[in-house]
Regions:
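Hydrophobic residues in well-ordered beta-strands that form the structural core
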Residues: 38, 76, 101-103, 132, ...
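A contiguous active-site-proximal alpha/beta segment in oxidoreductase catalytic domains
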Residues: 58, 81-142
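C-terminal helix-rich "cap/oligomerization" subdomain common to oxidoreductases
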Residues: 50-53, 203, 274-318
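Short, small-residue-biased leader/transition segments that mark boundaries at the very start
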Residues: 1-5
């Protein structure tokens, strides 16, 4: 993902790269005239202003703390950590820090989702009442990935937890989850689910529903629908092309875009833009470390609900 961010922006200079894969580090550095260093060397370099953390999840909290101690601006990919306890500890340690710390929930910056949020905030459909987020991957990841991912709720649905907080403008009070392994039995053997639905309740009675699946045969399905007191807003799928074939007995459209980088490449650029703008103008970042911890707490609540069959109160985890 570090490569993706760099390719999407011309107003920042890539100075140094650290990667456990030497070949990847050298290739990226060569493309952009950077040098390869260790992570500690990068963090301690006084000439480096900002750090992008796109490492394995179990290293995120450690790198956030180290980079914060060095007063670097930080953009860290989601999630903050696989452990909610560790993520909260990280938040406590850097809470008083003055350096910007942003968590990379790129879907907030998708132009269609951002426009939906703007329309909501402008009051175009009145009060929020019922939110539905659909997120289906075209195919499941390798089992080797599943085993280290932290599970569907922490790895996949965490995007939608953050997106629901962004759209609703507040956290839910309780979550209920149902999940099963329907796509690949090996995912179940690995201790995870590949198909899940989470229902969330809010203090004033609003409801949100998130639907996830690791498989959608027709492509990458990413939709949002929100019902308000005065109307409905929908963000639909982006298709491979806009050609519509109409016949006497059927109308055929193209399938949704298949791969997440194809769909969300613009959101990564917009996210990096927002990060740089905050750093340059000394303004608060749009997605905080606290936001990241909240999304992780929701993932933990969903996991507990699935395992116990009970609704989980979010305040018990925050």
């Amino acid at each position: 993902l570090g490569d993706v961010y760099k390719r999407q922006h011309r107003e920042s200079t890539l100075d140094a790269v650290a990667d456990i894969d030497d070949e990847s580090a050298n290739n990226l550095a060569a493309q952009f005239g950077a040098i390869v260093k260790s992570a500690d060397e990068i963090i301690s370099d006084p000439n480096i202003d900002a750090i992008l953390i796109a490492t394995s999840t179990d290293t995120h909290s450690d790198f956030i703390e180290k980079a914060s101690s060095a007063f670097k601006a930080i953009l860290c990919e989601k999630p903050v950590d696989l452990s909610l306890v560790r993520a909260k500890e990280c938040l406590d340690k850097v809470n008083a820090a003055k350096n910007p710390i942003m968590i990379g929930f790129n879907r907030r910056f998708d132009p269609n989702f951002a426009q939906l949020k703007k329309s909501l905030d402008n009051g175009e459909i009145g009060n929020r009442e019922l939110l539905t987020i659909t997120s289906f991957d075209p195919a499941p990841p390798p089992i080797s990935y599943v085993k280290t991912s932290g599970g569907l709720y922490r790895d996949m649905m965490i995007h939608d937890f953050d997106l629901s907080n962004f759209i609703m403008g507040e956290l839910p009070i309780s979550l209920s989850a149902v999940g099963h392994s329907l796509v690949d039995p090996a995912i179940g053997v690995a201790g995870d689910v590949d198909t899940a639905v989470v229902t969330m309740s809010y203090a004033d009675g609003k409801i949100a529903v998130i639907k996830n699946s690791r498989r959608a045969a027709y492509g990458y399905d990413q939709r949002i629908e929100i019902l308000g007191s005065e109307g409905l807003l929908q963000a639909e799928n982006i298709l491979e092309n806009s050609v519509l074939k109409s016949y006497y007995d059927v109308v055929i459209s193209s399938k949704p875009i298949y791969f997440f980088l194809e769909l969300y490449i613009g959101s990564f650029k917009a996210e990096w833009d927002a990060f740089l703008k905050s750093v340059r103008n000394h303004k608060p970042v749009p997605v905080t470390l606290k936001d990241g911890v909240a999304a992780l707490a929701m993932a933990e609540a969903a996991t507990q609900s699935q395992n116990t069959g009970k609704s989980i109160q979010l305040k018990e985890l925050l």
